[in-house]
């Protein structure tokens, strides 16, 4: 594929809901935020300093500017003499696009807690005063009155500050500015050859024709009442398996979700839209101390829509831990294995027909050379080829057999009903018996007349669903919030949250890579997964390589440095050191506004495992011939392989196996180890959430019993990753599905034991 290749189809637009009428920032606060963002990603010019407004552009000496142009041309492989695109690229600032203000407004107004929003606005206001600026920058001039170069030096100074507040502030603001610029820049994609979508010859399939219950308009204040046997809250990986099994067993099932269904022609969804339509909280939830960024699916189909296709079953040592340490012997049994095998069979999980891209090949080949354990990762792609590096924003081809392609259609065909746009506010209980659930109550919001969610002509109704049984499948972040808002008091609700924290490594190669092409995660190095002998360590894997998701996680070292680093992405591969975290955190509703709040900081124990994984990844990249190696650890420069010939192609030889005992490289790894993972400005990332309503043997140590029944209640169940007793150590999707199937089997067994049950004794679920 040439650098000018683009997707041969149009992705259907998915407009966002309107912003609040009131601007979340005042004029002074906007001026300061723009001044900071422009210092992070500055307009760079080649001009006489006397002719440049230094507040609006950062002039570079002619030789520095010309050298930068040459390097960017080489990195982007522009062959012609026309450097207009490079000039435009350098001249762009973070706020050049009119989308900047809209994206910031949406984030501040809709996706920040009141506490975080007030903190940000306070800092921005302080920097707009002489006194505040003097205290925070050392200049007695408001920040927006400083030149771009001076502002850059202020931010770099914050990076090195002894005050954790300033280090954390610098990281957060630099990350935000880079994310928005990478999403909105008109030149980054052209120079990288980044297509924004996979190249397919065929049109997107139509997708399953879901029918959703529509609540009629009414002038009455009384809620709409719907009755069913089972209501399932959440359409993610746990809820959909339960829905299929129960519907096929003959029960009347309704699945509700606060989000909406988007058909394949909307995929891969534009990044600025995907954050709102496919992910929770606008794309990311940040922990209270800012240490970890958590992404979770929030759409019809849940996390299975954005999963990277990796489909791993829980390993033996994890199952033994759950059976022995947590008193749950069924996890070591054949029935649980059958549940795992059945859900994998439905999705066509296998390692057949995988076309490993460069990044995944490097892991397998590097591990082989070093004698480390590694393997291909099974994919839920129906046993077919699935070369899609963008399906973290939805799978256009339906090659990924997620919930909207498999279990939800199966449930529909068995008679299940669906309601989208239904936010459950509380679980309801019988007035005569406060332990007995009677269903759920919440607010339903229709689509607009155009079939989207951006219009203002949307119907809102209160709805009560009366159900004999209620299953909560909102995921580890949202399930405990619903239980707490519904009045449940078990002290374990929301606690023991595990996140599989990761840190990143980037390798730069001499050849063109285009890391967004091909499947995302098809190999794993598991040599270091059991570093403590107790089942805890780090796995080494590839990660999604979309520019705005990957590049901002690395330390910002100045505007020109970042723009040159961005151009290297065309030749990059990216990796994660993923820890099976032994120690957890908690999730709870913000006491001021009820918003989801995550209290989690990676423990020293788990950070040691992450760091070990980072160093081992670097060793593997070196052995495979990477030209440059970067960690997402502040205070550590990248390793650049010395070479007398700048055009040497050290990574092209399949027989190139340089020794990791090279003195320069060894010294660099020692520096990485000595530097450690400093707090609070080392970034961590999580795409797996587990354990916040864990399963156990008693309400003294857990929230649910071995059949998913919530302690102290009747007919209330949880079927999602929140019931994991501890971290799974692998992508939790398959484990979640297997557990949900077992919980559904238990419900069917209970139904069959009751007189006049709708479930016939000889009925067999077809899963």
Placement of each model-derived feature along the sequence:
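N-terminal Rossmann-like FAD-binding beta1-loop-alpha1 element of flavoenzymes
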Residues: 221-255
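Conserved redox-cofactor binding core of oxidoreductases
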Residues: 172-218, 330-430, 437, 632-668
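N-terminal FAD cofactor-binding segment of flavoenzymes
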Residues: 251, 258-317, 359-368
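FAD cofactor-binding and catalytic pocket of flavoenzymes
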Residues: 490-621, 628, 642, 648-651, ...
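Extreme N-terminal leader/targeting segments of oxidoreductases
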Residues: 2-31, 35, 39-41, 47-118, ...
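Glycine-rich loop(s) and the adjacent beta-strand/alpha-helix scaffold that form part
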Residues: 245-272, 293, 299, 413, ...
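Rossmann-like flavin
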Residues: 135-139, 143-173, 181, 300, ...
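A glycine-rich dinucleotide-binding beta-alpha-beta segment and adjacent secondary-structure elements
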Residues: 383-386, 391, 428, 439, ...
